[in-house]
């Protein structure tokens, strides 16, 4: 854990720019001096400590910033939280002259304690790793990919309707008992938005805020491969919509229905080379413009498998004017949203967020973590690479460098203080307090080893056994 006495220099510039941009949207009202100081230090603290924890922020600042005041600002200060994300996006787009790109949609789970009660939108989800269940927050992300940078644009918390969940469980139980549908309770109306509606809402919000931005394509995984999602995006903007469909979905060839898997078994694939994750990869692919039953109109359906794979995956596109190779190339960009999510979990503090209760607590914590992502594009080393049309540095390597910079600045302040020895002893005590030694159950100090032996009276009783 590195010390942090002052707000990082590039963060100060970034937060000041946020305030200036806010004045353009907020009738001349930007952030107050106190809000600028608070936001700058908190963003710096998240980068240095990789957590959103007010007690840790107090320790690494040598108690310059008290945890009670930090959390008080977080909970009660009237910051324009939603507008902060908007103006931050405007800053990044303007800084690098970004006018077009591809939108990616994906969701991720943030696991929580099974005893959680007051965290917003925490619910039971299936654990993909174990096959069991856990309690988690599910977050839908909208991410923009451009020819220079990849940035998060927005998020939404998904929460299933509790009444509908109860009805579904009861309905399944009655089905097993072979109770007729007419005698089972009717399905209640859902009062919560589903994931598709949340995804469409995120795209709609971005388009309304940036109407001049050219969206080349919207890409999402097979969960969004359906008519409702496609129609929702089409109602917002005219763009290519790329997704996947399941192998058992029905398509029509010469008016006859059959599964998409059975259809493409009839045709040998064509070898192609595509660029995926920055590397050339050999693939087998074959595309057809055919009518999909679930969509009710023609789609460009492409069967694709990578070298070494046995089964095809089936990619769909709504704009039939694109070439198959271009559709596949756009679809491979989906891995970038996964990279963003891994960076966000590993370096943006939210994955180690101290419990913040309620909707506001979760939303504000997540906004802070995404502002950290945006702020990194204003670090002088990162911006120099992007301006030179070179690949930007990884989030991990950049944050490691920033931590060293913060450490050197702190050492410099200690050396030039009025009483360097006293200042050193104080900060060392605070930093060592972050890593307190905890008792390990692995080392069983009070274990009585003498109990692990046979007893004389039992040995005599069972002498002739075995």
Language model segments and positions:
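A short, flexible helix-boundary coil/loop motif
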Residues: 1-37, 45-46, 53, 59, ...
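Electropositive nucleic-acid engagement tracts
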Residues: 22-37, 45-122, 205, 209, ...
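Active-site-proximal, Lys/Arg-enriched surface segment
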Residues: 43, 73-174, 284, 289
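Electropositive, glycine- and tryptophan-enriched low-complexity nucleic-acid-binding patches
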Residues: 68-73, 127-213, 298-314, 318
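Short amphipathic alpha-helical "interface-anchor" segments enriched in bulky aromatics
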Residues: 109, 324-355
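Short helix/loop capping segments that flank catalytic or ligand/cofactor-binding pockets
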Residues: 112-114, 152-153, 228, 251-253, ...
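Domain-level cores of phosphate- or acyl-group-handling catalytic modules
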Residues: 177-256
